[in-house]
Amino acid sequence: MWPPRFPPPRPGMSEETRQSKLAAAKKKLREYQQKNSPGVPAGAKKKKKIKNGHSPERPTASDCQSPENVPTDHIAPAPPTAATDTMFLGVTPSPDADLTQSHDAGNCSNLMEETKTFSSTESLRQLSQQLNGLVSESTSYINGEGLTSSNMKELENRYQELAVALDSSYVTNKQLSSTIEELKQQNQDTLDQLEKEKKDYQQKLAKEQGSLREQLQVHIQTIGILVSEKAELQTALAHTQQAARQKAGESEDLASRLQSSRQRVGELERTLSTVSTQQKQADRYNKDLTKERDALKLELYKNSKSNEDLRQQNSELEEKLRVLVAEKAAAQLGVEELQKKLEMSELLLQQFSSQSSAAGGNEQLQHAMEERAQLETHVSQLMESLKQLQVERDQYAENLKGESAMWQQRVQQMAEQVHTLKEEKEHRERQVQELETSLAALRSQMEEPPPPEPPAGPSEAEEQLQGEVEQLHKELERLTGQLRAQVQDNESLSHLNREQEGRLLELEREAQRWSEQAEERKQILESMQSDRTTISRALSQNRELKEQLAELQNGFVRLTNENMEITSALQSEQHVKKELARKLGELQERLGELKETVELKSQEAQGLQEQRDQCLSHLQQYAAAYQQHLAAYEQLTSEKEAIHKQLLLQTQLMDQLQHEEVQGKMAAELARQELQEAQERLKATSQENQQLQAQLSLLVLPGEGDVDQEEEDEEVPQSSLAIPEDLDSREAMVAFFNAAIARAEEEQARLRVQLKEQKARCRSLSHLAAPVQSKLEKEAVVPRNVDDSASEESNQALHVAMEKLQSRFLEVMQEKVELKERVEELEHCCIQLSGETDTIGEYIALYQNQRAVLKARHLEKEEYISRLAQDKEEMKVKLLELQELVLRLVNERNEWQGKFLAVSQNPGDVLTPVPTGSQEFGAADQQDDLREVSLADDIEPAQGEAGVPAPHENPTAQQIMQLLREIQNPRERPGLGSNPCIPFFYRADENDEVKIMVV
């Protein structure tokens, strides 16, 4: 309350009344100061704040005028109470000044309030000065000094002014106190909000860090699973590559066998040398194909020249044949002369021999004439066959030219494919490098530490970056797979190119051999010409003429044999080329199938990864609700260990199967080695047969020995066994060995026929020797006549012939004995060969049985793996259904829980008792603890009579239990283990109930 105005003191007023009034005024002033004391220091603090904010300096209540600043006419010692009161007005501190200072530091709207507080303090200062003056006047009045009326008026005016100033200051103080209280309240509210925001922010940070850690763990697990799957795929690829390499090794073996068979090819290899050189140059120099074409054209031109030379040689041979025919006519003349001489000799010998001997000589002459006629017809047939062979040779040359053009086109196509593959490989490598750089940049960004106070927004950006990183990982894996496939294709192409280089080198070597043989043939032709000149000089001898005809016949036989060999070699080469093309096509198809399987597996891996991502997203959503489900997690770990044991058992079974496969392969290799040994034995026996045939050829008569020797030399290579390269089945091997045995038997029969012929020749020689010997005996009895000289010469000739016949007869008999011994040895060798073929057939049967067993095991393994994959897919489908049902059941439970909470919040509206399940929920909410909720129960607050329904009344719970029973008891799936896979956030207990921890 503001003190009332007092009238001015009168001059005659007593000192006691004045002192009492002053004391009352001081008391009221103190009360007023005590009431308004909280508001005054605020202004002082604000002024101090303005000084700290570089505002212009203003006087405060603490800087009020001291008693020395009062005018001299008012100077008087003031009482201590007034001085202390004035100091209290300007110096009293406030406890909330710091809060207001911290809260209003940057607000420009409080400047007007500060000016108001400044004016109130100024008015208080003036009031204190007036009080000091009044006190000084009172003291002066007490001391005996009189007051004038003017002073009294001034005092009254001052008093009125002070009253007005006090009223205004009171109003302003009230306003300031209200504003201060409002500011305090605002400051307190802002502090509370800041604390709440800090707590919320810390909680959000903790939740986000937990979720990010869980996501990182999940990503680490998925990466580990993907790495394991990648390792499995790599092992599968390694197995397929090993199988492909084995097939390539088999193809190399086949190629080596083909190369051994090609050594006997003659003119075919000469024409194929162009193709081989082109292939070799294409493999070595992929860019110099045009130069190689020119070289091949030159070689073709040379070959055409060589063909023309051969034609010229054939024409020369024809001319020589004509000369031989002329020589034959001359020989016939000589024979006629000899016949005349023989007739003369017969006339002379008629005296010493009987008519029977003369008749035998005539028969011999007739037989010689018939042989000459037969030889002439045979020569004409040889000429016709030579012409036919020339025509066939021209046809073969044309066919080889067409094949060479086809091979040139194929080589060009292969070079283009290699170039395109190199370009694709470089492009893929660039893409991989770019992806690696982008991955490194993303990893560096991910490894950078997050800011201390990240906002709530960047989580989405991080998720986007993670998605991009996963996509880049997928692209990188896909590109690496493509790059590996490209590398494998390049390796296969390089391997094929190397094989073709080896073949071309062998063909070149054979061409060189053929050129050397051509030179040798030229030399042989020259020697033949020289021999024929010598033969033309000795036309008188029938024996030499027979040898020439035999040589011609041998040449014809050689040509026919070479023709047959060339045709057979061509057919075999064509067949081999077809088989190689078919095998190449099969290998390419297998490679394509492997690529498709790899792509399918990669797609399946991507699908599984997407499913895992979906499952992980669901798990992250429910991870906060099921964190403390430790018992179920331990059970799941035990199940995981059991599954791991099952997987180990399966891997052991797979290792056993692989070991058995390796054993089967070793057995197959042993059988193959035994086959090779048998083939070597067959070759040795064939060589022995050749040696025997050569020895037999030495036993032929001197007149016909060369002919038979050359025939046997031509028959030996025909009887040599050519082991085929495609003996895969048992039937083929048995047929091959039966054919070999039949061929050996044929050779044995042929040798027996030769023995019979030798016997017949020996008999004929004995018959020829008998009349000559009788003639000699008769000559010894008959006396010599006038023609002693002629008879002596004829007797000497006959004696020499007899000696030769006797020596030849003895040699033939010895050779006959040796031939019998050799025939017995050959029969023994044939018996051994038949026994060895039987053992080889048994080995082949064992190999086929082992191969069938391995195939059956492999099929069983594939069926088991397919069954496991099918069970895995079915288990995935069931788990997805189970997850959907659990989510549906959880949603229903949440709905019923919400309904129950609504009912529990309004207990007055519900008359029925609350079921036990709802009481448990209320207790859980009050205690803020975790509680186990059975999914088999379905809490449902009923309207009317409340009760807990049975588990079988809820269809979702029934479906969940049915799926869990199917998963735990897979009776229809023998391939799966006894412990099924169940996600870790739920599991059935002994009562077939799923318990979930609810927060």
From Swiss-Prot:
One of its GO terms (cellular component) is endoplasmic reticulum-Golgi intermediate compartment membrane. Residues 271-280 have a biased composition (Polar residues). GO terms for molecular function: importin-alpha family protein binding; microtubule binding. It is a peripheral membrane protein. This is Golgin subfamily A member 2. Disruption phenotype: Mice are born at the expected Mendelian rate and have normal weight at birth. However, they display strongly decreased growth during the following weeks and die between 15 and 35 days after birth. Mice display ataxia and motor coordination defects that worsen with increasing age. Mice with a neuron-specific gene disruption display normal overall brain architecture, but the size of the cerebellum is strongly reduced in adults. After the third week after birth, a progressive loss of Purkinje cell is observed, leading to cerebellar atrophy. Homodimer, may assemble into homohexamers. Homotetramer; forms a parallel homotetramer with a flexible rod-like structure that can give rise to I- and Y-shaped conformations. Interacts with GORASP1/GRASP65. The homooligomer forms a complex with GORASP1 with a 1:1 stoichiometry. Interacts with RAB1B that has been activated by GTP-binding. Interacts with p115/USO1; interaction with p115/USO1 inhibits interaction with STX5 and/or RAB1B. Interacts with STX5. Interacts with ZFPL1. Interacts with AKAP450/AKAP9; leading to recruit AKAP450/AKAP9 to the cis-Golgi. Peripheral membrane component of the cis-Golgi stack that acts as a membrane skeleton that maintains the structure of the Golgi apparatus, and as a vesicle thether that facilitates vesicle fusion to the Golgi membrane. Required for normal protein transport from the endoplasmic reticulum to the Golgi apparatus and the cell membrane. Together with p115/USO1 and STX5, involved in vesicle tethering and fusion at the cis-Golgi membrane to maintain the stacked and inter-connected structure of the Golgi apparatus. Residues 147-895 form a coiled coil. The modification Dimethylated arginine is found at residues 18, 30. InterPro entries: GM130_C, GOLGA_cons_dom, Golgin_A. Residues 1-11, 448-457 have a biased composition (Pro residues). A motif (Nuclear localization signal) lies at residues 26-49. The gene is Golga2. The modification Phosphoserine is found at residues 37, 66, 273, 438, 697, 934, 978. Keywords: Cell cycle, Cell division, Coiled coil, Cytoplasm, Cytoskeleton, Golgi apparatus, Membrane, Methylation, Microtubule, Mitosis, Phosphoprotein, Protein transport, Transport. It holds the Pfam family GOLGA2L5. The keyword Cell inner membrane does not apply. Widely expressed. Detected in brain, kidney, lung, liver, spleen, heart, skeletal muscle, thymus and pancreas. Detected in spermatocytes. Present in oocytes during all oocyte meiotic maturation (at protein level). Extended rod-like protein with long coiled-coil domains. Phosphorylated at Ser-37 by CDK1 at the onset of mitosis, inhibiting the interaction with p115/USO1 and triggering Golgi disassembly. A report however suggests that Golgi disassembly is independent of phosphorylation at Ser-37. Phosphorylated at Ser-37 in prophase as the Golgi complex starts to break down, and remains phosphorylated during further breakdown and partitioning of the Golgi fragments in metaphase and anaphase. In telophase, GM130 is dephosphorylated by PP2A as the Golgi fragments start to reassemble. Cleaved by caspases at the onset of apoptosis. Residues 1-86 are annotated as: Interaction with p115/USO1. It is found in: Golgi apparatus, cis-Golgi network membrane; Endoplasmic reticulum-Golgi intermediate compartment membrane; Cytoplasm, Cytoskeleton, Spindle pole. Residues 989-999 are annotated as: Interaction with GORASP1/GRASP65.
